[in-house]
Amino acid sequence: MLKSLSLSALSTIALAATAFAAEPAPSAKNGMFVDAKGMTLYTFDKDAAGKSVCNGPCATNWPPLIVADNSKAAGDWTIVVRDDGQKQWAYKGKPLYTWAKDTKPGDTTGDGFMNGVWHVAKP
């Protein structure tokens, strides 16, 4: 039992570490923004311009797109500082996220989630 709990804890830590991995600036593909792995990016209506309010369990389900150390904001691409101090990519001031339930590039299962407050990020 203890061994399976330890494996479960390690899996959770590994998942959290990969979910918040640093990324270069997003790109557009098929009319929507995607991360470096081709996963769909989303915006959250409850975020204020330049401020993410998706923290804790929200950020577990909607991992923020964390800025790689060598990346710089340019044009409509901005960087916001999260409550935990991490830097997150934003487009026109709207923080960007992936969705934990999207399993492959091109999935858009988070679009319209939670009574329509989550949206696919588009150019």
Task: Spell out what each predicted region is.
Residues 2-4, 20-123:
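Compact beta-sheet-dominated domain cores in extracellular/mature segments
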Residues 8-16:
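Bacterial N-terminal signal peptides
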